[in-house]
Amino acid sequence: MIGGCGSLFLPGTKICAVDSPKFWLAYWRSMADSYAHVTYLEQRFGNGAARLDIRAYRSARGAQREGRDTPEAQFVRESHEKRATENDHAKPLITACRTSLMFFEGNSSLEWTFVSPPAMYRSGRKTGTYETLTDYIPLRGDQNDSGILEGRLKGISTFDFAIAIADEAERRNFREQHWTAWGEISDDEPAPSPYINL
């Protein structure tokens, strides 16, 4: 089964990322600060309001970082972050992924594995390498510190995530476990769109 990163726990806790306002804030800030991630999200969202929202938020964060902040940019940042931490639009879907995991946990009547991508999952180049972790969201720095999450969320390319899933199908290292895989995505160049517009 494939879920979402929101079902992974924050380090040292039994709090799922989906239930943590500080996760949502770190998630959207990290997404907005990455040109490759913004492009990936725009490809997924299409030409709707969500596409404009992420682009405006990225621009507002850039204005603040570059010392050219305006009241309008501040409004965009504050309203986006308030919405993200109070009731992010993706929360119902991610909560549903967590619920589906709960149907498997403790169930030994069938052989299962449940993989969740790390927070910074996107199209990107194939490296063929990845690392794994069970139950917890992978972070840069001290993996046991769930204090500040901003700038610490790890990721993986869709190619490397697919390799991790295929490897698990063959090796079965994570039977009856919830796990994740992450890899190198340091380049900030958008990958060609994996989506086809009809």
Where are these regions (language model features)?
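Generic beta-sheet signal
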Residues: 1-2
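Oxidoreductase cofactor-interface core, primarily capturing Rossmann-like NAD(P)-dependent enzymes
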Residues: 5-198
